[in-house]
Swiss-Prot record:
It holds the Pfam family SDF. It is a multi-pass membrane protein. Belongs to the dicarboxylate/amino acid:cation symporter (DAACS) (TC 2.A.23) family. One of its GO terms (biological process) is L-aspartate transmembrane transport. It comes from Klebsiella pneumoniae subsp. pneumoniae (strain ATCC 700721 / MGH 78578). This is C4-dicarboxylate transport protein. SUPFAM superfamilies: Proton glutamate symport protein.
Length: 428
């Protein structure tokens, strides 16, 4: 029995995270040296993200009967993203005003090390809506795949899928080749995922060894407040959306538990992207919907990042005694509605977006970013986990709204009545 338990990726990753925490705490110098293991795993995952998105989107679109369905799916997805991410921003704003984790700190901004955040402030200057939209268009197809820019690859894949669909029977050979290539890529992903425990161990050992548990204690109130808010958002907001769509958020979380642990260990929701594409399709969502919603959601539907941005900005104001009345906070909300999309496609961009927002708002000290620089790494876990669950729920919701969801398949899989690797034929 024990052997079968430890063959589970879920248990292996959980054990690796625990060992990483212990090593980082008791042997911090050694723990900090484990960083290459985490970096290597994330790089391996990033290596296959572009081809898996391309194959999934192309075969999904080219295999559809009507191209109008693709446009409808995209429009519904963007509407959902905007509404839910706005709710996340507002919830973060309300909670941080009620709890006030930064009140009483009385930090003088002039005493903070502005140099520590200078690099983030500099990067933030390049993050704008126009720059973001232009960046979606790749300089070359090869460049899009080489850089691993999700939105650039997605744009090319959508255009390729449309063009292949228009070829009709003439494009069948190309379609078959891409579908076979997709199976090869998922085979590579299965091999890479065997290294997930090593990657999670290295990333967690580095985090604890580098920043220490002491960092958590110093600004613990903000961290606890943020984690509780993320949990409430998942259970209450996403839970209500899930219930209205016909499934349990808790059963869904159990279904993607391995992906959640991988994200917890690496602090990167991108590390689970390839597996999420596969799992959401096996859950009963049509491939074309999964291929559009998941990659787009990684830029437009980052609920955890939205909560973090409003909470962190107001926390800095509270800690530095910077006055923020209701008009300032509404301005902050409006700016975040734009800036949170402007850099969301960049991995680990939460801190950069925060720097861009504070610079744009104007009346908050940029040096105040130094207050949360040390704990940002610890908050990234909650951000990434919430983002992952949010994108999974979004995929099911959009699939149901556009009538591309096999409800029976979803119900059977979530209730363990049928293995997730068995799928029913989805009716058109």
């Amino acid at each position: 029995m024990k052997t079968s338990i430890f063959k589970s990726l879920y248990v292996q990753v959980l054990t690796a995270i625990a060992i990483g925490i212990l090593l980082g705490h008791f042997y911090p110098e050694l723990g900090a040296q484990m960083k290459p293991f985490g970096d290597a795993f994330v790089k391996l995952i990033k290596m296959v993200i572009a081809p898996v998105i391309f194959c999934t989107v192309v075969t999904g679109i080219a295999g559809m009967e009507s191209m109008k369905a693709v446009g409808r799916t995209g429009a519904v997805a963007l509407l959902y993203f905007e509404v839910v991410s706005t709710i996340a921003l507002i919830i973060g704003l309300i909670i941080v005003n009620v709890v006030q984790p930064g009140a009483g700190m009385n930090v003088d901004p002039s005493t903070l090390d502005a140099k520590a955040v200078a690099v983030y402030a500099e990067q933030a200057k390049d993050q704008g809506v126009v720059a973001f939209l232009l960046d979606v268009i790749p300089g070359s197809v090869i460049g899009a795949f080489a850089s691993g820019n999700i939105l650039q690859v997605l744009l090319f894949a959508v255009l390729f899928g449309f063009a292949l669909h228009r070829l009709g029977s003439k494009g069948q050979l190309i379609f078959n080749v891409i579908e076979s290539f997709s199976q090869v890529i998922f085979g590579i992903i299965n091999m890479i995922m065997r290294l997930a425990p090593i990657g999670a161990f290295g990333a967690m050992a580095f985090t604890i060894g580098k920043y220490g548990v002491g960092t958590l204690v110093q600004l613990g109130q903000l961290i606890i407040c943020f984690y509780i808010t993320c949990i409430l958002f998942v259970v209450v907001v996403l839970g209500s959306i899930a219930r209205a769509t016909g499934f349990s958020i808790f059963k869904f979380i159990r279904y993607i538990r391995e992906e959640l642990l991988i994200v917890l260990g690496t602090s990167s929701s991108e590390s689970a992207l390839p597996r999420m594409l596969d799992k959401m399709e096996k859950l009963g969502c049509r491939k074309s919907v999964v291929g559009l919603v998941i990659p787009t959601g990684y830029s437009f539907n980052l609920d955890g990042t939205s909560i973090y941005l409003t909470m962190a900005a107001v926390f800095i104001a509270q800690a530095t005694n910077s006055h923020m009345d209701i008009f300032h906070q509404i301005t902050l909300l409006v700016v975040l509605l734009l800036s949170s999309k402007g850099a969301a496609g960049v991995t680990g961009s939460g801190f950069i977006v925060l720097a861009a927002t504070i610079s744009a708002v104007g009346h908050l000290p940029v040096a105040g970013l130094a207050l949360i620089l040390g704990i940002d790494r610890f908050m990234s876990e909650a951000r990434a986990l919430t983002n992952l669950v949010g994108n999974g729920v979004a995929t099911v919701v959009v699939a149901k709204w556009v009538k591309e969801l096999d409800a029976k398949q979803m119900d059977d899989v979530l209730n363990n009545r049928v293995p997730a690797n068995k799928t029913h034929e989805l009716s058109s």
